[in-house]
Amino acid sequence: MGDPAAYRDSTQIVLPVGTLEDIEVDLEAEFMVSVFRPTDAEIVRIIGSPVVIKEVTEFLTRHGVHMP
């Protein structure tokens, strides 16, 4: 069985709160993802399939979002 951390890394992107302010609507309109904001942390999780997460990473890079 695969490493759970590796699978999780391929199905989510974790960013600081506020990173998606200007592009969240476009992100959710263009990709089949869920944007989750835990109440106990200053982060945003973008959750989707591994294929979609790769495409979202490219989208975020094009929009000037620096990946951690």
Curated annotation (Swiss-Prot):
A Pfam family that the UniProt record links to this protein: VNG_1110C
InterPro entries per the UniProt record, alphabetical: VNG_1110C-like
Protein name: Protein VNG_1110C
